[in-house]
């Protein structure tokens, strides 16, 4: 059994007592750090960086050297699964992801292989093992995947989208084909996350970035149903510790009760949700992660501290809160801002845990 020096993050996700509120940042390993840009340049391109275990480890650890973070998150991408399915993923300079072979019909769905995590995605598992070794038990390591719905949006659209017309056309005109794809993706995500857990991640998160573009019934049928299947299929204890599961739907504030009923341990919240309200609605069932608007980091240190204090006050006394941004950190925030943010969370949260 690995002894963790800092268990704050895992304890908060399980709503166990902590000395202060734990904090990490979505996309904490990323383009806002000059050392990340240097490492990416060394790798050549984004996916080469993901596929090199030593470099992926290096960028995972970079933010921990600068800031007093309570967790590390695996440096990877949500599109590793569709890439391993053979869709021809590429990232153009300054562009989002593109797939050379989008999924457009039933035969394309039927022909998709379910990747073996220790074969086609072995580079991710190698990165997990390398990071765990180099962390030396300082903080827990978070693994992650995209949700089936979010992965499907990229696979059907052929890349990023604003209107999601292709996948919504499939959803309304040929729902059986989309359900077939989502079911296959859920199976792939279960295998992938369980392999990450076996390789050493100590908590997992499912990112449903685009669930919020769906109508009420469609969210339950085409997104949440498949995240529920994933939660049911995950390893929940490993190496003497429970392995907490966090679900995050951006724009998902309407569905907190339904999300909390999946059996997950925590819900990620974006900044459109009031934390006090969310706690009143589902705080008896799950922990909550979030939820400062990442754009606050453009503000003065005093304004950042004010926002942190407000969000801590919204959650109030007790455990069950992991402080985070409501989405990924922006790449051009002032260099001092993340430190001000992280230190403020620790400084001002102590009184809520006494």
From Swiss-Prot:
A single GO cellular-component term on record: cytosol
Domain of life, source organism: Bacteria
GO MF annotations in UniProt: uroporphyrinogen decarboxylase activity
EC number: 4.1.1.37
Family of the protein in this entry: Belongs to the uroporphyrinogen decarboxylase family.
PANTHER family: METHYLTETRAHYDROFOLATE:HOMOCYSTEINE METHYLTRANSFERASE RELATED, UROPORPHYRINOGEN DECARBOXYLASE
Gene behind the chain: hemE
Subunit structure: Homodimer.
Pfam families: URO-D
Cell compartments where the protein resides: Cytoplasm
Source organism of this protein record: Histophilus somni (strain 129Pt) (Haemophilus somnus)
Keyword check for NADP: no
Site (Transition state stabilizer): 77
Record-level GO BP terms: protoporphyrinogen IX biosynthetic process from glutamate
Catalytic activity: uroporphyrinogen III + 4 H(+) = coproporphyrinogen III + 4 CO2
Function field: Catalyzes the decarboxylation of four acetate groups of uroporphyrinogen-III to yield coproporphyrinogen-III.
Swiss-Prot/TrEMBL keywords: Cytoplasm, Decarboxylase, Lyase, Porphyrin biosynthesis
Name the UniProt record assigns to this protein: Uroporphyrinogen decarboxylase
Main localization category: cytoplasm
Residues the entry annotates as binding substrate: 27-31, 77, 154, 209, 327
Parts forming coiled coils: none
Pathway entry: Porphyrin-containing compound metabolism; protoporphyrin-IX biosynthesis; coproporphyrinogen-III from 5-aminolevulinate: step 4/4
């Amino acid at each position: 059994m690995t002894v963790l020096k800092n268990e704050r993050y895992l304890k908060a996700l399980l709503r166990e007592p902590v000395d202060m509120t734990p904090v990490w940042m979505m996309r904490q390993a990323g383009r806002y750090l000059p050392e990340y840009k240097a490492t990416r340049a060394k790798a050549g391109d984004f996916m080469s960086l993901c596929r090199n275990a030593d470099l992926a480890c290096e960028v995972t650890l970079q933010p921990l050297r600068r800031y007093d973070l309570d967790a590390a998150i695996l440096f990877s991408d949500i599109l590793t699964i569709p890439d391993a399915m053979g869709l021809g993923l590429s990232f153009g300079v300054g562009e989002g992801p593109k797939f050379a072979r989008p999924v457009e019909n039933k035969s394309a769905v039927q022909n998709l292989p379910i990747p073996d995590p220790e074969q086609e995605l072995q580079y991710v598992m190698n990165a997990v093992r390398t990071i765990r070794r180099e962390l030396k038990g300082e903080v827990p390591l978070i693994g992650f995947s995209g949700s089936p719905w979010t992965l499907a949006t990229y696979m059907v659209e052929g890349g990023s989208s604003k209107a999601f017309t292709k996948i919504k056309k499939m959803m309304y005109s040929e729902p059986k084909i989309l359900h077939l794809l989502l079911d296959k993706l859920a199976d792939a995500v279960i295998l992938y996350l369980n392999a990450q857990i076996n390789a050493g991640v100590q908590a997992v998160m499912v990112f449903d970035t685009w669930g919020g573009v769906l109508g009420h019934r469609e969210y339950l049928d085409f997104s949440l149903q498949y995240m529920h299947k994933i939660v049911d299929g995950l390893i929940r204890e490993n190496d003497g510790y429970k392995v907490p599961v966090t679900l995050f739907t951006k724009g998902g504030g309407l569905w907190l009760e339904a999300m909390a009923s999946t059996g997950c341990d925590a819900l990620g919240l974006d900044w459109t949700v009031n934390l006090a309200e969310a706690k009143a609605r589902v705080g008896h069932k799950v922990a909550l992660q979030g939820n400062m608007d990442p754009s606050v980091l453009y503000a003065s240190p005093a304004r950042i501290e004010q926002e942190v204090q407000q969000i801590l006050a919204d959650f109030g006394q007790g455990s069950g809160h992991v402080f985070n941004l409501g989405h990924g950190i922006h790449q051009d925030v002032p260099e001092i801002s993340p430190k001000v943010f992280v230190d403020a969370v620790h400084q001002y949260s102590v009184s809520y845990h006494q």
